[in-house]
């Protein structure tokens, strides 16, 4: 179940839909997001604005999620995974690897993301599979 929650986040990301992100994320002032190379974002308004910016500047994005580890603590689910990414920005196709930590909190029987931290992988090796 916890891995399914993580997968829903990447489905929302892949769809480039802010409406889907609205449903995945908590909307409190204490949630946190750190995109690779960005400053710390705190609170849903700042985080939502970051997703709008990313989606407006991305033509398409595909993920192959590997090396997933999940820990469950009562009402918290912590996932760590490798995002194998193929994205199109403008006319350029970019492949990259991002190590991510995603934390979800169960509230009123629904799991919501409260933390996302992505870090670029040095010396990333592209997997030998198509991400499309």
Task: Give residue spans per PLM region.
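A beta-strand edge to alpha-helix "cap/lid" segment located at domain peripheries
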Residues: 1-23, 30-132
């Amino acid at each position: 179940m916890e891995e399914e929650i993580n997968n829903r986040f990447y489905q929302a990301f892949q769809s480039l839909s802010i409406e889907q992100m609205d449903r995945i994320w908590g909307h409190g002032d204490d949630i946190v997001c750190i995109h690779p190379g960005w400053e710390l974002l705190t609170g849903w308004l700042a985080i939502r604005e970051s997703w709008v910016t990313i989606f407006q500047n991305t033509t398409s994005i595909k993920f192959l999620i590997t090396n997933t580890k999940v820990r469950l603590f009562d009402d918290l689910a912590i996932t760590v995974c490798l995002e194998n990414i193929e994205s199109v920005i403008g006319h350029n196709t970019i492949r990259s690897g991002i190590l991510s930590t995603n934390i979800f909190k169960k509230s009123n029987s629904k799991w919501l993301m409260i933390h996302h931290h992505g870090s670029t992988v040095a010396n990333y090796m592209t997997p030998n599979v198509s991400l499309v």
